[in-house]
Amino acid sequence: MAPVEHVVADAGAFLRDAPLQDIGKNIYTIREVVREIRDKATRRRLAVLPYELRFKEPFPEYVRLVTEFSKKTGDYPSLSATDIQVLALTYQLEAEFVGVSHLKKEPEKVKVSSSIQHPETPLHISGFHLPSKSKALQETVDHGPPADGSENLEFSSFMFWRNPLPNIDHELQQLLIDGREEEEEEEEEEEEEDELEDSDDDGGGWITPSNIKQIQHESEQCDIPKDVQVGCVTTDFAMQNVLLQMGLHVLAVNGMLVREARSYILRCHGCFKTTSDMNRVFCGHCGNKTLKKVSVTINDDGTLHMHFSRNPKVLNPRGLRYSLPTPKGGKYAVNPHLTEDQRFPQLRLSHKARQKTNVFAPDYIAGVSPFAENDISSRSAILQVRDSMLGAGRRRLNPNASRKKFVKKR
């Protein structure tokens, strides 16, 4: 396996003890990755690395580019600041040593390919043998001679298509014949099953010590890297999705190239329209709040396939039917978000909280106190409304803070 020229390592590569000296010649990472590692054994290995670990910070323009691209793919909520910097460093090294002409600026659009077989139906599973249908049934089908003109006339006539009248004598004779035929068929089926079992044992599909390495490579969807200049070793699926959709090379912990990755889109289960804008809450086609996250597989050739879950809990309507509260007015009203174009109050701070005390300002007017007043008595202060410049909105300061949902009445 030819080593990659420049390899960017994520925290997962160090935690999994990947042989980076065999995977690449020049190993890069950022300092935040090393700070993330708290494992005692991993930090002990980092102290005595058998290769030179180079620290390099990505440029801000590449960080912005990767951030915008990850928002379009829907992986931005799953990425941390360190992950984005690792992606930006990979993009920067690719731009320096290879170029950016082959990289994609926009993610691939989802193409839904319809097939007769269910997408979740297993075809070739390593270690599992799916018995095929009996070939004896196909051999017993006799096509017979071609139909004559008289038969065609009979087929197109009215008497052929009318419901046949019941023939009791024929049915009684058929019952006597069926009893003998069933006994003969049971004996023949037992013989055929024994023959099929013998033939199935000789076939492939089983994991043996001789083919276990090949099956492991096939299950990982990996290839041996050839003529690869820059690659990123990561175990994060969100990072792998972004790298593959941008056209960058993704390396597994064992040094193999990853061919497939999984991304996500939003699909409306009301009108069945899809969108790659993961920031949407309401469907842009029907306007309902019926968008669900659907996984999409991205192959190495850029084709995408959607995978639907059979779990009934995914589309469980429980909790969707409830009485709406009475709409409230005022500057600080909190009403449920029902439509995309619904208007909400601005939730501005009080006049006292917006005052800035700057004694060196030319238009400063001395008041009772030269110090800034802390507003704690106004309605906005009680509701913990923040400044719009700092991201004011309809949410609590701490979304993880516990709050009482159900209060028992005494």
Curated annotation (Swiss-Prot):
Residue span(s) of domain PINc: 5-108
GO MF annotation list: RNA endonuclease activity; zinc ion binding
Keyword Metal-binding: yes
Pfam families in UniProt: PIN_6, WRNPLPNID, Zn_ribbon_NOB1
Binding site for Zn(2+): C268, C271, C283, C286
Region (Disordered), start-end ranges: 180-210
Phosphoserine carried by residues: S199, S323, S350
Acidic residues composition-biased segments: 180-203
EC numbers on record: 3.1.-.-
GO BP field: maturation of SSU-rRNA; visual perception
Compartments, as annotated in UniProt: Nucleus
Cellular component annotations (GO), alphabetically ordered: nucleus; preribosome, small subunit precursor
Annotated zinc fingers (NOB1), start-end: 258-330
Major subcellular location class: nucleus
Family, as annotated: Belongs to the NOB1 family.
Functional note: May play a role in mRNA degradation. Endonuclease required for processing of 20S pre-rRNA precursor and biogenesis of 40S ribosomal subunits.
Subunit-level organization: May interact with UPF2. Component of the small ribosomal subunit, ribosomal RNA processing complex (SSU RRP complex).
Name by which UniProt lists this protein: RNA-binding protein NOB1
